[in-house]
Swiss-Prot record:
<keyword id="KW-0472">Membrane</keyword>
<dbReference type="GO" id="GO:0071320">
    <property type="term" value="P:cellular response to cAMP"/>
</dbReference>
<dbReference type="GO" id="GO:0005829">
    <property type="term" value="C:cytosol"/>
</dbReference>
<dbReference type="GO" id="GO:0070161">
    <property type="term" value="C:anchoring junction"/>
</dbReference>
<dbReference type="GO" id="GO:0005886">
    <property type="term" value="C:plasma membrane"/>
</dbReference>
<feature type="binding site">
    <location>
        <begin position="10"/>
        <end position="17"/>
    </location>
    <ligand>
        <name>GTP</name>
    </ligand>
</feature>
<dbReference type="GO" id="GO:0003925">
    <property type="term" value="F:G protein activity"/>
</dbReference>
<feature type="modified residue" description="Cysteine methyl ester">
    <location>
        <position position="181"/>
    </location>
</feature>
<dbReference type="GO" id="GO:0005525">
    <property type="term" value="F:GTP binding"/>
</dbReference>
<keyword id="KW-0488">Methylation</keyword>
<dbReference type="GO" id="GO:2000301">
    <property type="term" value="P:negative regulation of synaptic vesicle exocytosis"/>
</dbReference>
<keyword id="KW-1003">Cell membrane</keyword>
<keyword id="KW-0449">Lipoprotein</keyword>
<dbReference type="InterPro" id="IPR027417">
    <property type="entry name" value="P-loop_NTPase"/>
</dbReference>
<dbReference type="Pfam" id="PF00071">
    <property type="entry name" value="Ras"/>
</dbReference>
<dbReference type="GO" id="GO:0019003">
    <property type="term" value="F:GDP binding"/>
</dbReference>
<keyword id="KW-0636">Prenylation</keyword>
């Protein structure tokens, strides 16, 4: 079974842990308890293929920056999360993406931009178009708005990253073997 190392990044309080726990355990964590670093494993089926996801739920961008290079180096796919209710969390992601590209030393990194807390429409300050425009600037990066509370696009975030990783590095043994016939 293929393993996938996914990393959830973003500012403090955007809902990184809420999204991760909702995906892995199916529960919504109401209270804010700042994360240092949590790792979760979940087996899922994506496009008929069994996958073991290792999801690293990271500290907010303003804390524990020394650890960040290491999990950027080891991660295969990245969810960059902001809150639609806080402009600063959206603005913080540009530096984060640049850091990932620098550590990975490539522009082709499986990544998804996630506008979280879309259930709080009346508190929205970051428009959906802003997210779509930023995703376009980022080489047509995937983009979703989500809500851990309302279970909107939670699974899709992680499944999309798996699909991106599969496109970038196809599953070994999945391609049809070429058979040859030798006449002697």
């Amino acid at each position: 079974m293929r393993e996938y190392k996914l990393v959830v990044l973003g500012s403090g309080g955007v809902g990184k842990s809420a999204l991760t726990v909702q995906f892995v355990q199916g529960i919504f964590v109401e209270k804010y308890d700042p994360t240092i670093e949590d790792s979760y494993r979940k087996q899922v089926e994506v496009d008929g293929q069994q996958c073991m996801l290792e999801i690293l739920d990271t500290a907010g961008t303003e804390q524990f920056t020394a650890m960040r290079d290491l999990y950027m180096k080891n991660g295969q796919g990245f969810a960059l999360v902001y809150s639609i209710t806080a402009q600063s969390t959206f603005n913080d992601l540009q530096d984060l993406r640049e850091q990932i590209l620098r550590v990975k030393d490539t522009d082709d990194v499986p990544m998804i931009l996630v506008g979280n807390k879309c259930d709080l429409e009346d508190e929205r300050v970051v428009g959906k178009e802003q997210g779509q425009n930023l995703a376009r600037q980022w080489n047509n990066c995937a983009f979703l708005e989500s809500s851990a509370k309302s279970k909107i696009n939670v699974n899709e975030i992680f499944y999309d990253l798996v699909r991106q990783i599969n496109r970038k590095t196809p599953v070994p043994g999945k391609a049809r073997k070429k058979s040859t016939c030798h006449l002697l």
